[in-house]
Amino acid sequence: MIRVEDASIGTVWVTCLLAVGLYFIRSRLLSDQFAGFPSVNSRKPWEVLNVFAHRRFQQNGPEYLKAGFAKSPVFGVVTDLGPKLVVSGAFIEDFKDEKLLDHYRAMVEDFMAEVPGFESMFLGNLHNTVLRDVISVITRELDQFTLPLSDEVSTALGDTWSDSPDWTEVTLLPSMLGLIARVSSLIFVGEPLCRDPAWLETVVNFTIVRHQAILALHMCPAVLRPVLHWFLPPCQKLRREIKTARSLINSALEELRKNPPTDRFSSLAWVDAFASGKKYDATMVQLRLANASIHSSADLLAKVLINLCEQPGLIQDLRDEVISVLEENGWRASTLNQLKLLDSVLKESQRLHPITTGTFSRFTRQNIKLTNGTEIPTGTPVMVTNDVAGDAAIYPDPEVFDGYRYLRMREGADKARAPFTTTGQNHLGFGYGKYACPGRFFAATEIKIALCHMLLKYEWRLVKDSPHDMLTSGFASFRDPRARIEVRRRAPDPQEVVLTIK
């Protein structure tokens, strides 16, 4: 193997030029792969690399998707994750046979899963088994987690939002990230690490830095990425975050092995026992859990709170529902399933403002023929989008936030599709099929618990003139991270005193 320090300048230059040439040829072949399909945001004739098209899509993704769908339900586009054949979610059923699709290759291409520092997506068969099984255990044991999660939410909100009866200003998204990171970590790593500021900062930063590093690598020719990732600042920063996490996890594991827990579940302890001495990377397992859960849940929670600020009348209806259901049933996972209006508000927020419109990324293993007759060739990078969420034929007034939308659906023929955690062809917020988000039941539980505490114990309102518009980056959409709200502890009504909420 030729090391950079041993190679002559000429050798390095020739290697780089060959790599760029191969990248150019590969890019042209990918462009030809979309021949016969309408396209938007194609590389300009004078653009040798895709970097400019990547940046355009990152800055104006929704506009390019709108322009593409105006041409056809299937079209080619250079995205910030590379060239994709975008397909309307109306055809999601045509992709239900996973044997025809390559999920792993899509993860490798989209998220650089085989680059050092990005391995949290895939770590071999043991790690995939561990992650699948630990999520199954968490889902199965949600009832036993409900009270501990409620206690942690109560304490964390007191720290984050304070218990002052006076209006206190907070920046919304950071406060939600801190809350969700702490509550999730109670189940993921247990006490006391779940409250360690260094751990909480690391798991929040990891996803942000990882996303920045992925986008940076997508700007580079694919053949140069195995070298360039060692030098790109976002990639170097990502490895520093992993190093910090590894130190914290190793210390926690050492303590766990000395004093095994007997009365409280944590995935860190469970996974260590499950591995039964087999070699595995506990740090990357935990970072994968954090990457999949913290930002998506915090994002949805922030969007819900702003939606409620804009429709304050809905808050009292939600508050009344929480009081009624908790008085009758107490804190149990099954109780949360009875909060049907709250469930509707969550699903409507996700429908109107999904964290990403690109919900289903695959490579085709074989030619796939859509129900409209369109044939997609083997080896095509496909992105099925959640555009059906804005289809007026499915959702009347789709651009309007209607917190009661899915509550009404429970009374009709489509009632089975109404629950927040239910996936289907008309709602792809949690993905679809075999690889639909397995952690959605835990996410729904912790978000509902957090909102119960907020509704019964706090009032909140937007700070006047605070920016809170929806912003986009590529396929992603999010509320302005500068959005600020004012919160204060509310005096409960007499009938609320009986509730077992701290």
Curated annotation (Swiss-Prot):
The cross-references to Pfam families, in alphabetical order and at most eight, read: p450
Q: Where in the cell is it found?
A: Membrane
The primary location reported for this protein is membrane
Q: To which pathway does this protein belong?
A: Secondary metabolite biosynthesis; terpenoid biosynthesis
Q: Which GO terms describe its biological process?
A: secondary metabolic process; terpenoid biosynthetic process
Q: Which residues bind heme?
A: C437
Q: What keywords are assigned to this protein?
A: Glycoprotein, Heme, Iron, Membrane, Metal-binding, Monooxygenase, Oxidoreductase, Transmembrane, Transmembrane helix
Cofactor(s) named in the record: heme
Protein origin, superkingdom: Eukaryota
Q: Spell out the InterPro entries in the cross-references.
A: Cyt_P450 (IPR001128), Cyt_P450_E_grp-IV (IPR002403), Cyt_P450_sf (IPR036396)
Sugar-modified residues: N205, N291, N372
Top EC class of this enzyme: oxidoreductase
A GO cellular component annotation in the UniProt record: membrane
Biotech relevance, as the record puts it, is: Pyripyropene A and its derivatives have very unique characteristics of selectively inhibiting the acyl-coenzyme A:cholesterol acyltransferase 2 (ACAT2) isozyme. Therefore, pyripyropenes are expected to be developed as a new type of anti-atherosclerotic agent. Furthermore, pyripyropenes have been shown to exhibit anti-angiogenic activity against human umbilical vein endothelial cells. Finally, pyripyropene A also exhibits insecticidal properties.
Q: Please verify whether the record's keywords include Ribosomal protein.
A: no
Q: What is its EC number?
A: 1.-.-.-
The transmembrane segments are 5-25
List the Gene Ontology MF annotations in alphabetical order: heme binding; iron ion binding; monooxygenase activity; oxidoreductase activity, acting on paired donors, with incorporation or reduction of molecular oxygen
Q: Where is the signal peptide?
A: none
UniProt xrefs under SUPFAM superfamilies: Cytochrome P450
Record family assignment: Belongs to the cytochrome P450 family.
Official protein name in the record: Cytochrome P450 monooxygenase pyr9
Q: Which organism is it from?
A: Aspergillus fumigatus (strain ATCC MYA-4609 / CBS 101355 / FGSC A1100 / Af293)
Gene behind this protein:
pyr9
